[in-house]
Structures are given as C-alpha cells and as structure tokens.
Amino acid sequence: LLAHGTREQIDTYVRPMMEGRFFGTMCLSEPQAGSSLADIKTRAEPQADGSYRLFGNKMWISAGEHELAENIIHLVLAKIPGAPPGVKGISLFIVPKKLVNADGSLGERNDVVLAGLNHKMGYRGITNTLLNFGEGKFTPGSAPGAMGYLVGTANRGLACMFHMMNEARIGVGMGAVLLGYTGYLHALDYARSRPQGRHPGAKDPSSPQLPIVEHADVRRMLLAQKSYVE
C-alpha cells in the first residue's frame, strides 16, 4: 500500500497497521485456483461512488479471522467484469473486515465471513482460513457484496501483490528455519531425557540404561539437524 496506494489509503489503513491496531492478509488462492491465479473467479463489481463490491471465495488465508486486532485489512485479488482473460485481468482491492469511517473510527461489518479453518502442520499460533466474500451474511450500506477499494491501476493487481510477496518470501523462509531449529531443540531435549539401551559391549543387564543422546547414531542425526538449521 505504501508503494501503490493513495495517500488516503495509507492514512486510513497503513497507519493503524503500523500502530498494531489493524492486521492484514494476502488473499490470492481460491478453492479451485491455488498457484494458477489465472483461474480465479472472485469478481469485483464497480459502484457509482468509485468503490467495488466483491463476490467470491479465498482459500489458505493466514490470519484471515481472529480477535487479536481491531480490524483486519484483506488485500484481495479479483477480476473486474470485462477485464482481459488470465492474469492480465487481475486487480487488487482493499477489503476491510470492518469499514473505516472518514474520521478513522470503525463502522459497520463488511461482508467478509469465515467459512472454515485449514489445519496445517507446523502452524499453531495463527489461523489459516477459507473466507467468503459477498455471500450475504452482512449487507454493508444495505447492498450485497463485500465493499472493496481498488489499489493502483485496474488489471495491474498481480504486479502490486508480487511487490509485497517479495518481502513475504523472506519471512516464509525465516519461519521455516525457525520451525526446523525448534524441532532440533525438542529432539535434543528428548534425547537427553529418554533412556534406552546400553553401551555396545555392556555385559551387565542390571546396569542403568543410557539416555539415547549417548548413542552414536542418535548423535549423528542430531548433528545433521543442527547443521541444517544453523
């Protein structure tokens, strides 16, 4: 938004994000369109006031619904009717969970609704969601559809989204390394506390068992883990 949004969008949405009051999401994939973004079906219908009404579903949305912030700002890829086919017809929209009034206060609930939770291995501190846009749970402004606001130029949404994803990719890689390192620390702690077997050549069956960290092959595997993540 700092790179492609208007001054009004920055003041309305970015500043509260930097203050920690608003959170954000990236809404790209859909149930029928994962990495094949040319096949997305979410549509954005233009309104007389310059806003848009969005209708569709978005899948695999991290932090798509929670109560940790005052508001959630969804950045949504969608197609305006009559847009070119494929990725050349994708636009980017701001779709807040709660509409923001001109004075910065929160207004009525937008028609963005949690439809389901996706359970992903390794992620326990954040929700991963399926979101419905414009399916009628709420009617902001007494009209159907989730209210959205165009970011940048129509049909250039994918370029805007990739601008953000370049930085997000670094975060994903860092998260993977941290998960791997946490796994190593848990494995090391377990190996130090789990007794099993004795030294090769030990003859006395009454001697105490060794913690498995003293077994050569376990030490080899722990060293491999440590070398990967460090």
Regions of interest found by a model, annotated:
Residues M26-S29, Q47, L54-N57, S62, ...:
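Generic beta-strand/beta-sheet core signal
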Residues S51, F55-R109:
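A short core secondary-structure module
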Residues R21-F23, D39-K41, D49, N71-I73, ...:
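Active-site lining segments that contact anionic ligands and/or coordinate catalytic metals
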Residues L1, T25-C27, F55-I61, N71, ...:
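Glycine- and acidic
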Residues Q32-S35, E65-E67, P84, K120-T127:
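Short Gly/Pro-enriched turn/cap motifs at secondary-structure boundaries
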Residues W60, L99-A115, K120, T127-A168, ...:
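A glycine-rich, basic-preceded beta-loop-alpha segment at the flavin cofactor/substrate interface
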Residues L1-P46, N71:
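Long, structured ligand/cofactor-binding scaffold of large enzymes
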